[in-house]
């Protein structure tokens, strides 16, 4: 898959052939292998995660968003995360528009999914120079269960666009104002987000109404 192949090219160019030879973790990973990993002393995560990839063709209308989402890989251990992450292309190598979705297993990265339909997302816009660092820091916070009220978090998305990269964190309940603001504060704290950055929040039902992920946000902070 392109998002993995591009990372391989980067590793190959750097001369790190050992990384290329390492075993890929794909979306066909079985329960048997996960059990074997744990028996071999790997470190289990609190949540199992899946990584999804969306690549839409620019200029082509009426594309089914759901049909374009492809599940790439899943993992449930610290070692499984790094085996996946080291082969993912950096945001600077991904074409626009592309989305990487990092979600708890069993939750699809769709507004209509049962875990998401009553929720929303915090949105942060980054220049392409710094987005990869903040994205990595966010993933480490999610995998390490460092963000507050982790049960309320569904996942995160990296959206690569022409002139910016957008990172969003999805939560389950948009109507719980205290939880929404608590998540905002936790994200700011763990990403060490400079004061110049503005965070925006948008409920998924609003996205369904205007068919837009990042326009017409209703809360800034």
From Swiss-Prot:
Domain of life: Eukaryota
One Pfam family cited in the UniProt record for this chain: IF4E
One GO CC annotation: cytoplasm
Coiled coil: none
GO biological process, one term: response to virus
Single GO molecular function: RNA binding
Keywords: Initiation factor, Protein biosynthesis, RNA-binding, Translation regulation
Keyword Magnesium: no
Entry-linked InterPro entries: TIF_eIF4e-like, TIF_eIF_4E, TIF_eIF_4E_CS
Family: Belongs to the eukaryotic initiation factor 4E family.
Complex and partners: EIF4F is a multi-subunit complex, the composition of which varies with external and internal environmental conditions. It is composed of at least EIF4A, EIF4E and EIF4G. EIF4E is also known to interact with other partners. In higher plants two isoforms of EIF4F have been identified, named isoform EIF4F and isoform EIF(iso)4F. Isoform EIF4F has subunits p220 and p26, whereas isoform EIF(iso)4F has subunits p82 and p28.
Function according to Swiss-Prot or TrEMBL: Recognizes and binds the 7-methylguanosine-containing mRNA cap during an early step in the initiation of protein synthesis and facilitates ribosome binding by inducing the unwinding of the mRNAs secondary structures.
The protein, known as: Eukaryotic translation initiation factor NCBP
